[in-house]
Amino acid sequence: MKRLFSIVIVVLILLIAASCTVPDVSEGNTPPVPPAQSDPEAEDRKDPLEAKAESLLAGMTIEEKAGQLLIVGFPGDTKKEALQDYIDRLKVSGFILFSRNYTDFDSLYALARSLKEMNSLNNPLPLFISIDEEGGTVSRLPKGGTRFPDARKVGKAGEPGLTYKAGQTIAKELKAAGINLNFAPVLDIVENGENKLLIKRSYGSTPEVVSLHGTSFISGLQSEGVTAVPKHFPGHGNTNQDSHSTLPVIDTDKAAMQSRELVPFKAAIDAGLDAVMVGHIAFPKLDPTGLPASMSSYFLTDVLRKDLGFGGISISDDIEMQGYISSKDTVEECVISSFNAGLDIFLIGHTKAIQDQVYKALLDGCRDGRISEERLNESVLRIIKAKLKNGLTDTMEYEIEEAKRIFGSDEHKAILEELNGDTGTFLLSR
């Protein structure tokens, strides 16, 4: 087993070394590329997953496509009828679950199962069932699950094999609960102790440490079929402002961005990444509009897609945060601006009225031409491909008794004991 992890770590180190040279950050919008000429033989050579994704896309209504652009949360006392409305009317891409939504493993399992069953009756694509499970400060697993410490402690231990095992173990327990997407890890580089939001949640203060441990955690998660969504692109570390309450403005130039903030994201993309969370942070030296990255075509398209070569899904940080909604006069303006800039999915974790506004804005934008059909299909196709690639279904991976044996299992505790012996880092099971 240790030999396997040694091989994994060698591969990760090589990937990170290669990724430390980040392509030049774009100076601005690049001219459009002329459309490729059609090739009748290309259809025969098309990848089967791509062909299936395009077939599913062709059969979807505009309402179904708009719904795929939303991941939503809901209050703990939400009735089944309201959950059904998310699925039947809004046709959402997925849900984000918080501790308010369940009291223990049994209720979490039952909720995930119910959402999947409802969705399977009416929608063409399975749900993302998501959570924030970083370990430590940000941990949503119910009592009885295996809890790892904050990323800062894991990074200080200096054992990427430990980090891989942490990601893998978390993924096993998430999968047992019916969760298939995790908004983790944090890839922000934090050396400023005044950054109270992220100082414990970051693996360290250098691109090398954050890259090594971030890619290790991602590989561990994805080895068990859970989609990792690292955050907060393009980097929330160099500030003491919190985007929950304001729009952080970071005075970073091109050279610093290229040699520092972007390095962990480039390493993760090169190692294999299907989704990334985009933060509500502004970099006026790089994008003079002053818009947050989650609304900036410079970051969403020029840097993320063209410079870093990312082909997966871009998901916003929660758009109910002040760092986002304060950037335009209305929610509708924010949404249209973000989507046309290149964002794929809007995360809206709390308020039904805002979720309805976002869905209506997207639908109206598609119908009145502010959002082109080509742009809509581009994002929805990415989402379909990610769901197909990761084998998402609306059935639970395990029956309840088997799932309960996995969650907080003796095997996982034994892994923690092994890690404690190897590193001297105390990992707790709660």
Where does each model-flagged region fall?
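Second-shell residues forming the walls of enzyme active-site clefts
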Residues: 61, 103-123, 127, 209-374
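Hydrophobic faces of well-ordered beta-strands that scaffold small-molecule active sites
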Residues: 67-74, 92-97, 127-133, 181-185, ...
